């Protein structure tokens, strides 16, 4: 792993992550029991040819998986967190309007702690207060890195624009669309880079980026939905990671909170992160 600052080494990075874990009073690493669930990032690093094939398959599936999870008018008084008086970065109605809380009809063991309830239609509802807190934690973590040493990756269609906007806002690097195998692991590849931390939109769609981050030993921050497994994720941000509006809100908040923790004035509005439907 390349150095974050001149004085930062691998031991200090581990200590930093431990402090964040203590702050939230929970472990970021999932127990081995979660291994019985299919985890696309838990396999051994594939050969480059196999990785190319897997990336092509993921790209072919993209239009279907990027459909908005629910085409409905938001219910702005929906029950989405245990404490109705929780202090949030934005009004809870704004989270609801963007559908940040809307999970899938599948739930993994590793995401169970972030789920508030299940709706009558079978959709799991994510705890928005935990989403809000994890955005703050991720921003605090990212603010410790040199901007150019942060990499954000998003293969999902609806995550590409807000991910690129996030990179522009905080000075990070972005790799959107297909993640080319070897980007982090092959020094002979023209697009080879050595970031110190990776942010991904979805551990499934961005599995190649996650695998390479694991190989080179750098931490992974991931937007995770109710159907994700998190065994290879260091810091989970629980959110609807498929919806256009939800991803715009999450990346916007993460950018502004990161800038705020650097002592910079956040200068971006939500509209700057939104794409046309």
Curated annotation (Swiss-Prot):
Against SUPFAM superfamilies, the record matches this protein to: Ribosomal protein S2
Q: Which InterPro entries match?
A: Ribosomal_uS2 (IPR001865), Ribosomal_uS2_arc (IPR023454), Ribosomal_uS2_CS (IPR018130), Ribosomal_uS2_euk/arc (IPR005707), Ribosomal_uS2_flav_dom_sf (IPR023591)
Report which residue ranges the record marks as coiled coil: none
Report residue spans for region: Disordered: 1-78
GO molecular function, a single term: structural constituent of ribosome
What keywords sit in the KW lines?
Ribonucleoprotein, Ribosomal protein
Would you kindly state one Gene Ontology biological process term found in this protein's UniProt entry?
Answer: translation
Q: Which GO terms describe its cellular component?
A: small ribosomal subunit
Q: Which CDD domains match?
A: RPS2 (cd01425)
Similarity-based family: Belongs to the universal ribosomal protein uS2 family.
| Protein name from the UniProt record | Small ribosomal subunit protein uS2
Could you tell me the gene encoding this protein?
Answer: rps2
């Amino acid at each position: 792993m390349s150095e974050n600052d001149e004085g930062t080494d691998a031991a200090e990075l581990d200590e930093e992550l431990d402090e964040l874990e203590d702050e939230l009073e929970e472990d970021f690493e999932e127990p081995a029991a979660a291994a019985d669930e299919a985890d696309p990032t838990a396999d051994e690093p594939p050969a480059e040819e196999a990785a190319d094939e897997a990336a092509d398959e993921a790209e072919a599936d993209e239009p279907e998986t990027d459909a908005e999870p629910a085409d409905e008018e938001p219910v702005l008084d929906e029950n989405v967190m245990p404490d109705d008086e929780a202090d949030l970065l934005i009004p809870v109605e704004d989270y609801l309007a963007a559908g940040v809380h809307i999970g899938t009809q599948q739930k993994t063991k590793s995401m169970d702690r972030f789920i508030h309830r299940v709706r009558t239609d079978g959709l799991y509802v994510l705890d928005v207060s935990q989403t809000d807190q994890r955005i703050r934690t991720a921003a605090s973590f990212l603010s410790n890195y040199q901007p150019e040493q942060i990499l954000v990756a998003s293969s999902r269609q609806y995550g590409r624009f807000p991910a690129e906007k996030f990179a522009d806002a905080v000075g990070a690097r972005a790799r959107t669309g297909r993640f080319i195998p070897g980007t982090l692991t092959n020094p002979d590849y023209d697009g080879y880079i050595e970031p110190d931390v990776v942010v991904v939109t979805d551990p499934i769609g961005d599995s190649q980026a996650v695998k390479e981050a694991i190989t080179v030993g750098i931490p992974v921050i991931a937007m995770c939905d109710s159907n994700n497994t998190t065994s290879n994720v260091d810091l989970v941000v629980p959110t609807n990671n498929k919806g256009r509006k939800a991803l715009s809100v999450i990346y916007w908040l993460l950018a502004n909170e990161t800038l705020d923790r650097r002592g910079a004035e956040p200068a971006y509005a939500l509209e700057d992160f939104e794409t046309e439907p």
